[in-house]
Amino acid sequence: MKFETWEPVYEEILRDFGFDRAADERARDVAAEYAQAFDLDRLSGINGQTVAIVGAAPSLTDTVERVSGADVTIAASTAADVVREAGYAVDIMVTDLDKNNDTAAELTHEGTIVAAHAHGDNIPAIQSWFPTADRSNVLTTTQAAPIETVDNFGGFTDGDRAAFLADAFGASELIFVGWEFDDPTVDNMKAQKLAWAEKLLYWLENRRGE
């Protein structure tokens, strides 16, 4: 997805949450200080494939075996741990570095691609995590305008960014595993983010004709 298409939605998200665009841009620029140029040809294996988009909902432990029906598995945040513990491979991890950062770093050293996201309130995590990772396996992303070493394929939360990434590189089918949009256990901010994830995925499905 081109940024020109994403930007109006991004601006709506900023208004809804009261987020500061300049803060996102600062985080992007800090991440760029650590990021290496990523060879996007490494994502060509997504093209024409069935891709599992794995969320970290509590139901994941009971449904994780569904990833076996996919050609490529993209796991969001702590879903990567559940997938691996169940004996399945994670091909790409998507994270904004707010939880299982040791897993994210370990995956990069194993050669797995980690899409690490920079946004307005995770600059300290960026500064502490990037030096621990094999940066040749880090795809650095932003929700603001992309720059040379920091990409934007669309999406807001870890989970929906995984779906937008798969779409951007030509996935033929998306399988959603471990997703719950109505989770009474989460706080108001998380509930608002889940509502946006649902809205964004509906938009993406319409764009894909699904």
Model-assigned labels for residue ranges:
Residues 41-43, 61-65, 103-105, 165-166:
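Short, flexible, glycine/charge-rich loop motifs used to bind or transfer phosphoryl groups or to couple energy/partner
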Residues 15-19, 57, 114-120:
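Short N-terminal helix-initiation segments at or just after the protein's N-terminus
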Residues 53-55, 115-117, 141, 176-178:
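Short beta-strand segments
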Residues 1-51, 61-63, 173, 179, ...:
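N-terminal donor/sugar-recognition subdomains of glycan-related enzymes
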Residues 58, 120, 144, 180, ...:
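A broadly conserved detector of short glycine/acidic/proline-rich loop/turn motifs that flank catalytic sites
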Residues 45-49, 53, 57-66, 70-99:
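A glycine-rich, hydrophobic loop/mini-helix early in the fold
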Residues 71, 80-171:
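Acidic/Gly/His-enriched mid-domain segments of enzyme catalytic cores or analogous surface patches
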